[in-house]
Amino acid sequence: MVNEYNEISYAKKMLNSGFLTNRRMYELNILAKYFYYIGYKPKEVKTKVIEFCNTHFENFNEAKYFDKIESILANAKKNTIVEVGSIGITDKEIEFIQSLKETNKFNEVLFCLMVIKRIREKLGQQAYLNCKYSKFSKMCGLSSTKAIYPILRRMEELGLIRICRNSNVEILFNVNTTHGKHVLAVNDFDNICAYYRNYTGKSRYIECQSCGKMVRVHGNRQRYCKACAREMNIKKTIERKKV
């Protein structure tokens, strides 16, 4: 999971653990932006990125990746690092969703759009969904991209959204949260619907205590996602062998 909305937190995790996914060049871009953010100069940023690669990138060859590293550094220098933090949701917003008397799937998609709207507003951007429908479908917990189309059409009929010619979605609804009570804090933006499902009791999820990813609970003592649990077990095994 590459957290594109909380890049400062993500970069700090990289410095502690190395690469977190197989999208290494994308992650290096986040790391380079972070180094610029904390005040390093261009030459220092390049040195730090290469040091990181030498430590965490098996068989890394600076000459082989020269062009890619240069491109990453140039891109990072001109783009501001993104840190949304947590998105709080109030009881007024939940009540708005449920007042429409639509299906549970509809409610989950609307909740996801609500969070995305709040993210865009926090970044000073217009309230649009402009990612691929396949990615948005995953945020909504839908098994197929095809399932999103009838829901979006229904939302457009209700005046909640406007589907643009380029398939971007303008989010039109507004909820008055005055005197609203904070009931949810969304941190994992790759699995937004999990928070709504948790709140409504449809499913039970936890945030992995290592990476923050929302994962379905399969036992009362579960604290980590599968990947982090595997990594923790490997570390424990190594520590036991040292004794």
Predicted features, each with a name:
Residues 1-104, 125-127, 133-196, 229-230:
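Modules that initiate DNA replication and primer synthesis
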Residues 107-120:
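Detector for short helical micro-motifs
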Residues 208-212, 228:
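Short Cys/His-rich metal-coordination motifs, predominantly Zn2+-binding knuckles/fingers
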Residues 203-205, 222:
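Residues immediately within or flanking Cys/His clusters that coordinate Zn2+
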Residues 219-232:
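Cysteine-rich micro-motifs
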Residues 229-243:
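Short metal-binding segments enriched for Cys and/or His
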